[in-house]
């Protein structure tokens, strides 16, 4: 197990797990905008995009270095109802993501682009990630729990209650090199039957840490309205959390907060990292990931043309770029053999674009 004292950003060529890809696939088999953005043909045979892609927008010169001039934004798959939770398996070389209303997880193989149903039913899974042993960890709306899929196909329940009271509906999830699992619990999956099972929220919305030694749960913060997407900085010294409480709380901010991580286990007092206002309009940040330089790539939307897609923020909190999509972007992750491809779940579709940076973490 990795120790906190040895934490460092991943290198591009570093393997994610000691397992071989062949053995990993065998194990998982046991488990079963602008006018331009809106007008682009995203059908099965779209017209070619003239380079540079006009929907990769530089807002600050610092973003120019991350834009690949001769690559397009590609729609890799469509047909979902609300796509969420993209996670890259470096061992299996595949992407998994959730289609929450359809109660399935989907998998896309990197080598040939084949997409198939990975798990059905998925218990209305939302966020997914992979741990340091290559095991998938997921947030289930329908059962209000966090689970880990073992290599032999068994399911281990990591969390389903707080002091005997059911969780709200775990949403997004990340892993720490010490083996700890951190997840948000805003409760969207219990607000209706479309993305889970309608029920009552009986505990405060919060972010939790599951200790790797014994599985003890702790609240690391409950100071936000509805904590949603979350990610660590490259050195794991900071935790960024998107607050989407404005969906249900009138006074809730539309922002991303940042917290100091203390001893790898606790959080210091949070403060605003950035707000989601752009040109007088404010949407919501959702899922987010950090690159090796500490920039945040944030799925955003609910405004429309010229806003929906991915917003990129420098470590100082300034918005430096956008990737405009014709759909609301719920979440992102870096993947591909070199971790230089940004995958974006966006409402009914999965998109991807190559970038001149790499993801800071394993999934």
Walk through the language-model features, giving the residues of each.
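Blade-level signature of beta-propeller repeat domains, shared across WD40, Kelch, NHL, RCC1
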Residues: 333-363
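Beta-rich, blade/repeat-based domains predominating
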Residues: 79-93, 121-140, 145, 163-181, ...
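Blade-edge beta-strand/turn elements of extracellular beta-propeller
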Residues: 63-78, 114-121, 152-164, 208-226, ...
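N-terminal secretory signal peptides
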Residues: 1-19, 30
